[in-house]
Amino acid sequence: MADQLSSGMGNLSIDQQPPSGPQMGGQGQMRRSYIPPHLRGKMGDAAPPMAGPNGLNNSAWAGNNNYDARGPGGGGNWPAPGGPPGPGFEGQQGAGWGGPRPQGGFNPNAYRGNAGAGAGAGAGGGGGSFSNRGSGDGQWRDGKHIPGPANPRVERELFGTPDDPSKQHTGINFEKYDDIPVEASGDNVPEPVLTFSNPPLDNHLISNIQLARYNVPTPVQKYSIPIVMGGRDLMACAQTGSGKTGGFLFPILSQSFHTGPSPIPASAAGAYGRQRKAYPTALILAPTRELVSQIYDEARKFAYRSWVRPCVVYGGADIGSQLRQIERGCDLLVATPGRLVDLIERGRISLCNIKYLVLDEADRMLDMGFEPQIRRIVEGEDMPKVNDRQTLMFSATFPRDIQILARDFLKDYIFLSVGRVGSTSENITQKVEYVEDIDKRSVLLDILHTHAGGLTLIFVETKRMADSLSDFLINQNFPATSIHGDRTQRERERALEMFRNGRCPILVATAVAARGLDIPNVTHVINYDLPTDIDDYVHRIGRTGRAGNTGIATAFFNRGNRGVVRELLELLKEANQEVPAFLETIARESSFGGGRGGRGGGRGGGRGRTQTADYRKFGGSGGGGFGGGFGGAPASGGYGGGGYGGGGPPAGGYGGGGGAGYGGGGGGGGYGGGGYGNPGGAGGQSWW
């Protein structure tokens, strides 16, 4: 190309030739330079002097020509002698291309992918080592945990500022949590802790808790911290918004900071010391993408500046980026069951080093049909057996079938029931309005005009209604967005982010956002469509009144919702809320054969004791059950009056006899003695 350029220059006329002279670096010799067509024939000022052969040594590429000409900021952006440095990250050792060159030759540790070596500074901008892990990395060196340096930018990202509306802070009723009753059953239950202190917690974790501006442990944290730190398994029920996530993250991270990483099997190391398969020591399973993302964000907060690297995997997102994240190191893994099974099948995750297994919202995972995947993960892969790991189950509700499932996953566990689980917080003011379907939109507009300000979460039953209602509100000049299962993960995350930061203070959602999501500072929850299950209602309104803050929950009720009227009445009375007269009237109508009977049958069954009590104490009790039936003549039965009872878990589970089966026939056992009964046939036959 240079020859072509030279030959081309030879064809230029003399008046187009550049002048010679010392200013061109040629000491009187002719140097030909290319002149653009629009400048040809014009005599201009001489070009600035360019020292060195070919005029390169004063450019940003000078170092490529002459190694010794480089300035002190080596690495990728080599500055010109006497010129400004390259655009590296100023002041950061090895964090960018402008960092200093490595001293003393090649450092093989800088290229390793483990948590200890190379977790500090990068290799002088050479790019071989991954940079600090974003949350500020510490190291595990010589059996000690060495926290990394503070990073103000990352701290603002993780913890926000005191007046940041997107971060949850404790509210005015937070101290009332001390009045919530707590029941712990099991052998040798440890005493609760009253403060975040050492012991039992690690000092570095306490500093991160202080950065998050958490001052006092919630009731579930007061009990779960000493239980988990003592090596015990735990099944915990807690009122929504009570700090369940901290209840398992605090003790797991504290113990990890003390004990350090588990050794990776010798066969696992790949080329250059970097393995493709991850060996996490803690696994947290949750049912939805939003919930695992939320838990991951909390884990990043409390693992800040530590050696522990949290990772998150879930379906509906690019698996390639998740694999790259895992390859960079994964000590604490938050996952949905389906995506985790996929990664295990790909050979990218091993569970052989798991010390802590957490099932969050376990009842919801079973409701969504994840039991086969959960059993495969826990029992069918290389996870240590129940006696070689700690297992924790957390949820807002624990129906009896979940408690029985715990026999397979937990050992000598402590059952913790905090507050009225399956009930609601008194921080939430519940209002039930009688609204026919055709009037719902106009009533909704009245409410939104009346309660302007704050974040409002509106729950509907169908995806189509979510989009339709959000479009209607936008046309009425209300800034709204929607979230449901048909939206892509990127769209869902964007909608949640706009809702959190207040750009769209109205969010219309289906049940996908109802369970476990911690959306800070929601002041009003509206059940535009009431759910058919009272537990779903509990979880929906639990999105407000969190961490001691107050909130309002409004429900649109009509005779189409009479299936939940009895349970709704009981719920309002438990939480000391106003009970409208029309609810009492419709409840009386339902009791005369119209609607579904109560699930309670007294306090013996239904949402009461069986949802919150330790079945090991009450496993043999019958009574109640789903009593009442769907209504109708005794011959057609309904749910039957036999009830949960039975002979304790080993003898037959849901127990039985008595009453009709699910829809017909008489007699019939429970789960253990003949199943639910066969509709239209003899009750002794089983569906199972």
From Swiss-Prot:
Gene3D superfamilies: P-loop containing nucleotide triphosphate hydrolases. It is found in: Cytoplasm. Its EC number is 3.6.4.13. Residues 1-170, 590-615 are annotated as: Disordered. One of its GO terms (cellular component) is nucleus. Residues 103-114 have a biased composition (Low complexity). It is an enzyme of class 3 (hydrolase). SMART domains: DEXDc (SM00487), HELICc (SM00490). Residues 427-587 form the Helicase C-terminal domain. A motif (Q motif) lies at residues 194-222. ATP binds at residues 238-245. It holds the Pfam family Helicase_C. Signal peptide: none annotated. Keywords: ATP-binding, Cytoplasm, Helicase, Hydrolase, Initiation factor, Nucleotide-binding, Protein biosynthesis, RNA-binding. GO terms for biological process: cytoplasmic translational initiation; negative regulation of cytoplasmic translational initiation in response to stress; positive regulation of formation of translation preinitiation complex; regulatory ncRNA-mediated gene silencing; spliceosomal complex disassembly. The Q motif is unique to and characteristic of the DEAD box family of RNA helicases and controls ATP binding and hydrolysis. ATP-binding RNA helicase involved in translation initiation. Remodels RNA in response to ADP and ATP concentrations by facilitating disruption, but also formation of RNA duplexes. This is ATP-dependent RNA helicase ded1.
